[in-house]
Structure formats: structure tokens, C-alpha cells
């Protein structure tokens, strides 16, 4: 059975394909003529050179490629053939495993190298035999040995035989004659481990090592095959990859836990920063800086926990422009996360609650966007603060008589007070240009003869006085209009959709100033400059009574005027709806 890697049926299996492919020329086909010739030459040399004739038995085993010569003499000497010159390889094989190397004298190609192989044996007088041989084996031979070696004694012979016995295998004599083995070697029935040779593709510097000395052979009592040894790097690499993957998984889990902790900490910091932005109060220095000023009745303000440092307040809408407020503030590089309206106004409601330690506390300068301080939805009642919702709702009206007559409060007053007759008289007696003149409110004077507009005011009121003599019900027109306004006010109080939060109970004006009453943020009055005395703030703002007592010392008039105008503009913008803010910021309006 030819395995196509040397022509020997006992050749080892091919190594796995993961090894680097090395070009190896094929060895010549084995012949039996060289063996017979070498055996005859050896026998003739021994017979002619020995002083005392002794029968010599030569056993040649071609299948195992070894030459064992035993002499039946009284001195028990053993003749060993040692190569004179080592064979060098023309290439270098990569070292994959540590395997013992078979000496070149045991090569299967040493006996069948070529027809030009010459074996010379010379027998010395002392009984030592030395020889030289050359072969074309592709295996790296052992280190060169000196030519003149004495014949070893029985101890050396036993050591050499034990070393060579590792590579020998007992085979029947039929294999020595070139006959095929009894049981063919197939893929289904592989060759026994005892009949296998070492892999000639593997080279190693360790010459006298056995398989049991290999790290893999220590686990299976030296029964590890060459194929298993070649797979050791793969096993080690697989274990290394598993350890690396486990290490990466642990690192990923640690990173995920750290990210979750950082995310929770970031959310907590944002919540504390929003509260601090709403509630933080900054004292007014000697440069008379002011902003959105709301005098409060409490001395203490809500503080965030001591472990978390509050974020610095954000300057919105140009607050404190040119007054030195933004010199020590860090640059804002990230937009804050929007919060609910109740969270934004939570701290403001605590400040506006009645009660406290008196009205001598310093004014509270609120920093930030005015829209956050004046939200469109009231944090108390949850209703809208826009002008349309806060304006009183008109009395209901409807169309009756198949939608031909409008039933409303004004129409009822017109018919009840006979004002409809006066309107009809003015309409028929008026000129064309009188229909285009209005009373200043966009309503023509013909439709509203009782208006106070400047157009023909004397004539209209004179004719109404003359008609009241014939129509005395005209005298009830103004009382009925007053009753209608009272009904509208009552209806708007109970049916209004907007915020109707009233002002907080006021505190009297003191030496430090105070607030009389503060209504909803939609009805704030413009802020007047702060009063400054020698000890600091000497005046406050009272929305009901004006500026409280306290000397107004304008040491820096320009800064005060500029700050006051900036505060007024911010207050006006904070009171507007988003649509009106857009119109206010447009240069066309």
C-alpha cells in the first residue's frame, strides 16, 4: 500500500494540513541488492581480519532498517557501525513539538541510499571496528561522533540496546523478506501504536528524549501519538482564546455596571441642579446688580444635599448684561434636560408661601430663563395663564327662530330700552359718509349712538335726549348695561378657564422693605431700582404700595439705569405668551 510520501507501506500518516507545507523530494525506491552487498562486504572483512576465527552470525532486518551484529567470542565484544561524516539537511523544518530523533543509522534510506554507497569496515588488532557510511536521508542527523571509538562493554551495550529498543518493533520474519503484512492497514483499521515510527517531518534538538518525557506524554503514560503532539499548539491556543473571551466578558459586565451607576448619578445631579437653578439666591454686591427681583418673607432658602454641589445658575435672556454676573460662571457646554412644570416651580412656591421670620430678608435675585420662572401653566391650580384664558368670558348667546334672531344680553337690552328704534332712525337719516365713521372702537356711530366717540357727539346725544321724551324706556339703557357688566364678571369668575390664583397676604413695609401682595405671575408690575444705603439694601419693592422707605443712593447711576431697564424688559418678556414673544423679538413689530 503506497502512501505517496516515500513509497514505504510502513510510513507514518500525513501530518494535519494546518502545518506549513514544505517541499520535500521523494526518496529513491528501496532495493534489496544494496543490503545483500553490504552484508557480504561486512562478513568478508570480519573473516579476514580476525586473528582467531570465530563464527559470526549476521542478522539483517530490512523492515526495521537496523544492522545488528553479534559475535560469539569469549571476550563478548560488540561491533557497532558509526557513521564517519554526518548528513546535513538542505532545508530547515519548523520545530512544533519535542520528539526524540532517530539516529541516521536507523533510517530506512540508509541501507538503500544508492548504488554508489560504499561501506568500509576495518578491524583493528584490539577488536574495535569502525566504519563510514553516507546516505541521502532528509533527516537532521545527531551531533558528529569521533571516528575512533572503542568497543563498548556489556554495560554500554545494554544502554544502547535500551535506547534503540524504543524505536524497534517486533514484526514477523515475513516482513523482512518484503512480504506484505498479514492484516492490511486501512482507514477503518489503522496501524497499531506499537508499529508506528516517529514522524520524520518533525525535527528537534533533543535526541535522547522519550515520549513519556513530553508534557503531553506525562498524562497518558507515553502513549501520545505524533498527531496528538502536533495538535498541542491548537489546544493551547483554544484554551488561551477561552480565557481571553472570559476576561473580555468580565470587563464588559464591569463597564455596563459603571455606566449604569454613572447614569443614575447623572440623573440625580440633574435633579439637584434644576432645584438649585430655581432656588439659588445671589446677594447683590456693591455694583448694584439687579435682575428678576422678588422680595421673599423667609430668610432661609432650600439647599441641595451637602454631598452634591449645586450646579451654577444659568444666565438667561441677557440677565445682568455688562454688570459682571457672568465673569465667574463656567461655560455651559450641555443643554439641561427639560423637567415638568411642577418640579421647576416647587422651590418658588416654597419661597412664596406666607409666614416666615419677618420681612427684613434681602431681595431674591432669580437667575435663569424667565419662562421657567413664569410658566404658562400655574403650578398651584394647573390652569393656563395666557391672556385669552384669563380674560373674563362673555355671556353666552345663541341664534333662535330658525337662526334669524340673535338672542344675547346686548340684544335684550337694545329691545328692552327701545334703543333699537333710535338706531333705526339714525340709520335712515344718516348720510353715506356717516356710516364709515366709527366711535374709536371700530363700531360705526349709527350702530352705537350712545358711544362717546368724537364724531358728531353733540348731535347724537341731543337727538337721544329728544327721543327719550317720547320713549322713556331709553333712560333704562345705562342701568341695564351696568347690570350686564356685573353678570359678565360673575359668569367669568365661575366659568373661567384660566388661572385665578389671588395674591398672597401681604406684609407691611419695614426698614428692609417688603411685599404688600403678589398676585399671579401674569400680573406682575415693573421692577423699580433697588434702594441702597450704607449698610447694603435699604429698600424693597411693594407691588401694592410702591417703593418702601429707604434712601436711594445712586452711587453708580448708569449701572442702575441699565440694570433697571434690563429687568423691565425681561419682566415684560416673561409675562408674554410664546406667540407674543415671537412678535416682540421680530424687528418688524
UniProtKB/Swiss-Prot annotation:
Its main location: membrane. Disruption phenotype: Pupal lethal. Mutant embryos and larvae show ectopic tracheal branching. It is found in: Cell membrane. It comes from the Eukaryota. Induction: By the BNL-FGF pathway in the tracheal system and by the egf receptor pathway in the wing imaginal disk and the follicle cells of the ovary. It is a peripheral membrane protein. Residues 163-172, 276-286 have a biased composition (Polar residues). PANTHER family: PROTEIN SPROUTY (PTHR12365:SF7), SPROUTY (PTHR12365). Belongs to the sprouty family. This is Protein sprouty. It comes from Drosophila melanogaster.
